[in-house]
Amino acid sequence: MENQNRQNAAQCPFHGSVTNQSSNRTTNKDWWPNQLNLSILHQHDRKTNPHDEEFNYAEEFQKLDYWALKEDLRKLMTESQDWWPADYGHYGPLFIRMAWHSAGTYRIGDGRGGASTGTQRFAPLNSWPDNANLDKARRLLWPIKKKYGNKISWADLFILAGNVAIESMGGKTIGFGGGRVDVWHPEEDVYWGSEKEWLASERYSGDRELENPLAAVQMGLIYVNPEGPDGKPDPKAAARDIRETFRRMGMNDEETVALIAGGHTFGKAHGAGPATHVGPEPEAAPIEAQGLGWISSYGKGKGSDTITSGIEGAWTPTPTQWDTSYFDMLFGYDWWLTKSPAGAWQWMAVDPDEKDLAPDAEDPSKKVPTMMMTTDLALRFDPEYEKIARRFHQNPEEFAEAFARAWFKLTHRDMGPKTRYLGPEVPKEDFIWQDPIPEVDYELTEAEIEEIKAKILNSGLTVSELVKTAWASASTFRNSDKRGGANGARIRLAPQKDWEVNEPERLAKVLSVYEDIQRELPKKVSIADLIVLGGSAAVEKAARDAGFDVKVPFFPGRGDATQEQTDVESFAVLEPFADGFRNYQKQEYSVPPEELLVDKAQLLGLTAPEMTVLVGGLRVLGANYRDLPHGVFTDRIGVLTNDFFVNLLDMNYEWVPTDSGIYEIRDRKTGEVRWTATRVDLIFGSNSILRSYAEFYAQDDNQEKFVRDFINAWVKVMNADRFDLVKKARESVTA
């Protein structure tokens, strides 16, 4: 009987959900591995967020005793804990590494990664090999997070702790902007690479060409391999990797040298013994480890016995003090190649002076040799890096300033415009990488708005042209790093005015009309506002023509950026290589068009229903690239109807692929070709989830619902970058 009970307990008949990824139960993904992943459009659902719905982090941050928090962080730096003692009695280097690695995942290609959501707390980042033992840094911060609670997010705390660490060791910073809002589960939309093993590097092709949009050289690394490319200790080859990786983070050579040299002025690397002594990472650790990973059995498992990267030693003889000793060591000695006690490649100074030895991490009376990584020597043996490094060596104040500016850029690059920054230490200076936009000095009444809309509709521009231009302007927005969008009207400027997807000749014609209207108005109104207002007016007209008298909400206040305020190279990465909303694709890619559509929708911050209603509406409004007929399932182009969905789902038609990759929609009885379509169009009838939305909007009783949902989604995209509206609303509440 006892055995029978034990057997019944083991079977657990009431446990009907799949709660473990390693469960032997088969999931939909197992059956259909190529199934379109729509979950990334809903990854931050309210259900995962423990805050009340009315919680506003920016409002809570305003209640923060900011200077008291900084003082608590400063004290923490030298309050060494027995469970994880501070090297040299100072946690500063550990917190700099934590902040750096939080921000350093950012890449300009798609704006994903970075510090703005605090995802270092979650898999995979919390368990990346390059983040080994940063779990200890986060645990050291917990008493402070517990004390200040909702007034400081983890994401902000990580970066502020890095700032305080630098300042507490004599380094310079130029400020801090709060406003990073925590997420509550991993970000599944970020593509970190296709490798299935840590430190694998299957992301290269040809002449070491790194796969887009990746920036790191290997799975599980933040930047580059410190031992050299694929672990080969070649400083010149390492320089090539460094340059490409930092470029993909938006950093130039000077910023790169400043960051590497400045960061390695502090602290040490840890490789006291063989890696076989190190336990599993946090996500693989046993439950009793309580989220701590990399528990080591080597010696004490901490302090001087710590194993992290496998490289062992400090870079400088003064590892808790800002100075130029990094360059003193780099250029003052020849270096010989050896292996650390953990077996990692590193370089040691030839015959170092006693004054250039570093203190032991635990015993300051004991002196130990310093070291350099292969990536450090790249700053000496790459000609361009060497010029910059020697200049910094000879000009300490310039070096300190360059590091402070590069550090601020590193830790704030993914926060978007300056209007999002919070706190008393926000720099007054505008930086070009913040994509600055002049503030507007006008307001518009409802009557004035209606008058301008009438002028636009009577200008000779079509509904299609007005909608296309507004979409082209606004849809550059990336919710990942809060860049792009309609504010600034950079669609008038290089490089956006020349992008293929924007149909430059037609765009120039539309912009010329808007400029004429602007000149005729009795008060100054930005082109940015006119573009969005024109799109809104067109949508209203299209809805009226469909029988629905509706208003499209419009909020003026956009400014017009200048070419001088626009970094052409930086903005080039925002060019869409595919935009399924316009049925545009620059060329054939290995990724199916429907996946590119979902990726675009995710970057715009759209849900699956919003993506669906926008595609259906934009097709009938004639918003396709170069007026291509694909997916325009209507005889009433320019009228906001649900025809796209009605005809997509009509079983009187069949869908037939052609050799050109386009699909023909044929009458089942006559064989007549009625319409043509792309995979982006057909996915709304093929994918069962998207089909359910298509059926919803095709219903006879949902025609008005379709119009209203389209308008809501349209306004969401038009205002996606209007952080000033959020700020004004917040200020009106707190006034």
From Swiss-Prot:
Organism, as annotated:
Geobacillus stearothermophilus
Output the Gene Ontology cellular-component terms.
cytosol
Catalytic function, reaction form: H2O2 + AH2 = A + 2 H2O; 2 H2O2 = O2 + 2 H2O
Q: Which Pfam families match?
A: peroxidase
User: Which InterPro entries does the UniProt entry name for this protein?
Assistant: Catalase_peroxidase, Haem_peroxidase, Haem_peroxidase_sf, Peroxidases_AS, Peroxidases_heam-ligand_BS
Q: What is this protein called?
A: Catalase-peroxidase
Cross-link for Tryptophyl-tyrosyl-methioninium (Trp-Tyr) (with M-249), residue positions:
W100-Y223
**Region of interest (Disordered), ranges:** 1-30
GO MF terms listed in the record are: catalase activity; heme binding; metal ion binding
**Role according to the record:** Bifunctional enzyme with both catalase and broad-spectrum peroxidase activity. Also displays NADH oxidase, INH lyase and isonicotinoyl-NAD synthase activities.
Q: Where is the composition biased (Polar residues)?
A: 1-10, 17-26
Its family?
A: Belongs to the peroxidase family. Peroxidase/catalase subfamily.
Q: Which CDD domains match?
A: catalase_peroxidase_1 (cd00649), catalase_peroxidase_2 (cd08200)
Could you tell me how activity relates to pH for this protein? Answer: Optimum pH is 4.0 for the peroxidase reaction.
Give site residues, Transition state stabilizer: R97
For biological process, the GO terms are: cellular response to hydrogen peroxide; hydrogen peroxide catabolic process
Q: Where is this cross-link: Tryptophyl-tyrosyl-methioninium (Tyr-Met) (with W-100)?
A: Y223-M249
